[in-house]
Regions:
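Detector for methionine-enriched segments
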Residues: 1, 102-104, 122, 136
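Alpha-helical transmembrane segments and their membrane-interface boundaries
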Residues: 1-73, 77, 81, 86-94, ...
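Membrane-helix interface "capping/anchor" motifs
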Residues: 58-67, 105-115
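Active-site beta-strand/loop microenvironment that shapes enzyme catalytic pockets
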Residues: 77-78, 106, 118
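Internal alpha-helical transmembrane segments of multi-pass membrane proteins
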Residues: 87-111
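Hydrophobic transmembrane alpha-helices of multi-pass, membrane-embedded glycosylation machinery
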Residues: 98-102, 117-121, 140
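Membrane-helix boundary connector in multi-pass membrane proteins
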Residues: 110-111, 115-131
Length: 149
């Protein structure tokens, strides 16, 4: 068995890159000096799907930095607007996801993992600071990891 072939196997490298990036976000969220501050949340569930796209399919349009950053930013903003101005219901959650999807496609920043952000935002009842931590900070961390990869 060729060791170089095993070490350079793309799925292995993608898994390592994804795992390290999520571990970094997890460390910042749970172990770093930021963890007990308002800046401590750097990890959300949709980032798990994001690293699959970024590290597993780096040449895909959905994995490009612009799509990762603005896809997460846009969908989270839609969720925050909905949770701020509308009562949470199956209708408002569905509308938020639909509008977020429409906007990602219209602005050419589609990033499918970000489609879940309005759901998480509305269920969690978060507000505008959520756009910075974890969304922008986490997306930038993933983008940097993807560039290094």
């Amino acid at each position: 068995m060729n060791l170089k072939k095993i070490i350079c196997w793309p799925p292995l490298l993608a898994g390592i890159g994804a795992g390290i990036t999520i571990a970094i976000l997890g460390y910042i969220t749970y172990e770093s000096f930021l963890s007990s501050t308002d800046y401590g949340l750097w990890l959300i569930a949709s980032f798990g799907s994001t690293v699959v796209v970024v590290f597993g399919y780096p040449s895909n349009e959905f994995a490009q930095p612009k799509n990762v950053f603005f896809g997460h930013l846009l969908t989270t903003l839609v969720g925050i607007i909905f949770v701020t101005f509308f009562e949470i219901s199956f209708i408002s959650i569905g509308l938020a996801v639909g509008i977020a999807t429409m906007l990602m496609i219209a602005f050419k920043v589609t990033h499918p993992p970000a489609g879940g952000n309005p759901i998480a935002v509305m269920i969690g009842g978060v507000s505008f600071p959520f756009l910075v931590f974890p969304i922008m900070a986490g997306a930038i961390t993933i983008i940097i990891g993807g560039i290094i990869y």
